[in-house]
C-alpha cells in the first residue's frame, strides 16, 4: 500500500511527508483498522507491504514543531544552519531532485531563523542519522507497525539518508551501515519481516543494497533497471541494452532478489547504463531525449500518451509519466477509434507484462494495469494536484471499468484474461525457487 500514516493536508507529496510514523491518517482510518486489515489479509495468504519514509519527516511532525519552538534536542534531529555558509558548500556537489518545482536543497525556516536541509520539498525535512536518537526512534516506529501486522516494509529514498559535505549525498557507505543495522534489529525482534528497498539509482549502485551473504541489508529491491530497459526496448525496437542489463543481472550473487515491475506510483526515470550505451554507439543524451519525447507522444510515429516530469532545460533531463495502458498506445487507439492500433496496443501491454512475469524474482502488478486503466487527466482540474504530473497515473481505481473484466470481448476482459493466463503459467512448478533448469 501507498503511504497511509498521518500526513499534513493538502501538501503531503502523496503521503511521503509524514507527521506521525506511529498513527494511520484519520482520513484513511485508525491503527485498529490497519491491524484488522493485516489480519484479514493474512487469512487470505497475503502479506501487507507498507511504505516507510526513512529520509525525512513533514515540517509539521512533532519533532519539527519542537525544533521550531527552539528545543535543542529535536533540532539535532535535522540538519539546521544559521547562515548559508555550509548550505552553499552542499549545493556545489548535491544534485537537485526537483529543480523546477522545489529548487535547491535548503529551506529557510522563519520560526528558527535557520536553514533546513530539504532534499525533496520544502515541507519535507531531512533527518540527521548522524544523531543516534533518530535511528532509535525510526526503528521503534517500524517495530510498532510490525506489531500491527505489517510484514514487508518498502523503505523509501534509502540512498539519500546520509549527508556528507563534498559528496552528492547519495549512496554513501554510512547508508549501508544504517540499513544493515535495521536488518539486524528486525532479524532479532521480528525475523519474518522483509525489507524492500526503493533504490532508484544507476545500475552500478543497485546491487550494493543487498549487502553480502554474510552481512545482508535489503531482502529485495525494485528492479528499476530492467523496468527502464523494457520500456526503452519497446520504443526503440532495439533489445541490445535490455540484453546487456539482463546479462549483468543474472551474474549477481544468489542473495540478490528483485521485485520486477512495469509501472508504479512514481515516474519512469531514464537511468540507462551510459557505459553500455556508448559501447553500442548509442548517444546517451539523444537516446534519453528520444525516449521521454516518445512516451510523451511528442515524436513522429509514437503511439503513447503521457507527460514529462521534472524537465530540466539546463541538463536536458526529464522523466515520463502515464499508466501502462496509455504508454502502450491503448488510450490513443481508443481516441482514434482505430481497432488495428488497439490490437497492437493490447499486444504491447501483454508483451511487457509477459517479460516482467518470467524474470527471476517477484513480479509486481500495479493496481489498474489488469483492467487497462488509462491516464487520469482530470488531475489538471485539482489545484492541489496540478503541479505534479505524476498524478496523471495516480487516479482512483476505476471500479466501473473493473466490472467489464468478466464481459467477453471487452478491452478489460482481454487484459484480465491475459494476466490470469500469466498467473497460471507462473504458478507452474518449473518456476519454483528450487526448480532445476
Task: Indicate residue ranges for each PLM-predicted region.
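Active-site and adjacent substrate-binding regions of carbohydrate-active enzymes
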Residues: 1-437
Amino acid at each position: 500500500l501507498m503511504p497511509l500514516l498521518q500526513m499534513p493536508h493538502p501538501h503531503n507529496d502523496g503521503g511521503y511527508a509524514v507527521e506521525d510514523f506511529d498513527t494511520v491518517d484519520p482520513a484513511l482510518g485508525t491503527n485498529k483498522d490497519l491491524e484488522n486489515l493485516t489480519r484479514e489479509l493474512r487469512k487470505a495468504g497475503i502479506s501487507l507491504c507498507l511504505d516507510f519514509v526513512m529520509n525525512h519527516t513533514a515540517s509539521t511532525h512533532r519533532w519539527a514543531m519542537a525544533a521550531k519552538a527552539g528545543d535543542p534536542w529535536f533540532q539535532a534531529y535535522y540538519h539546521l544552519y544559521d547562515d548559508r555558509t555550509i548550505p552553499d558548500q552542499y549545493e556545489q556537489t548535491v544534485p537537485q531532485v526537483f529543480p523546477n518545482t522545489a529548487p535547491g536543497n535548503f529551506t529557510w525556516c522563519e520560526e528558527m531563523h535557520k536553514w533546513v536541509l530539504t532534499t525533496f520539498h520544502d515541507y519535507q525535512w531531512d533527518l540527521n542519522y548522524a544523531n543516534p536518537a533518530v535511528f532509535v526512534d525510526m526503528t521503534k516506529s517500524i517495530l510498532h507497525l510490525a506489531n500491527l501486522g505489517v510484514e514487508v516494509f518498502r523503505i523509501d529514498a534509502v540512498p539519500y539518508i546520509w549527508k556528507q559535505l563534498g559528496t552528492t549525498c547519495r549512496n554513501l557507505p554510512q547508508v549501508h551501515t544504517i540499513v544493515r543495522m535495521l536488518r539486524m534489529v528486525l532479524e532479532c525482534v521480528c525475523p519474518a519481516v522483509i525489507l524492500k528497498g526503493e533504490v532508484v539509482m544507476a545500475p552500478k549502485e543497485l546491487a550494493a543494497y543487498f549487502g553480502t551473504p554474510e552481512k545482508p541489508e535489503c531482502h529485495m529491491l525494485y528492479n528499476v533497471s530492467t523496468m527502464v530497459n523494457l520500456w526503452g526496448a519497446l520504443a526503440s525496437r532495439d533489445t541490445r541494452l535490455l540484453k546487456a542489463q539482463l546479462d549483468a543481472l543474472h551474474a549477481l550473487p544468489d542473495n540478490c532478489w528483485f521485485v520486477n515491475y512495469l509501472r508504479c506510483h512514481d515516474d519512469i526515470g531514464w537511468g540507462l547504463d551510459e557505459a553500455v550505451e556508448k559501447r553500442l554507439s548509442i548517444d546517451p543524451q539523444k537516446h534519453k531525449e528520444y525516449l521521454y519525447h516518445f512516451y510523451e507522444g511528442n515524436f513522429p510515429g509514437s503511439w503513447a500518451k503521457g507527460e514529462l516530469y521534472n524537465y530540466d532545460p539546463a541538463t536536458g533531463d526529464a522523466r515520463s509519466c502515464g499508466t501502462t495502458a496509455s504508454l502502450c498506445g491503448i488510450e490513443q487507439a481508443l481516441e482514434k477509434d482505430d481497432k488495428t492500433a488497439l490490437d497492437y496496443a493490447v499486444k504491447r501491454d501483454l508483451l511487457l507484462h509477459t517479460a516482467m512475469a518470467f524474470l527471476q524474482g517477484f513480479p509486481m502488478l500495479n493496481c489498474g494495469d489488469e483492467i487497462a486503466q488509462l491516464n487520469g487527466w482530470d488531475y489538471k482540474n485539482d489545484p492541489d494536484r496540478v503541479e505534479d504530473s505524476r498524478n496523471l497515473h495516480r487516479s482512483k481505481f476505476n471500479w466501473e471499468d473493473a466490472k467489464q473484466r468478466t464481459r467477453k470481448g471487452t478491452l478489460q476482459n482481454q487484459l484480465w484474461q491475459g494476466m490470469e493466463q500469466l498467473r497460471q503459467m507462473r504458478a507452474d512448478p518449473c518456476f519454483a525457487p528450487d526448480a532445476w533448469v
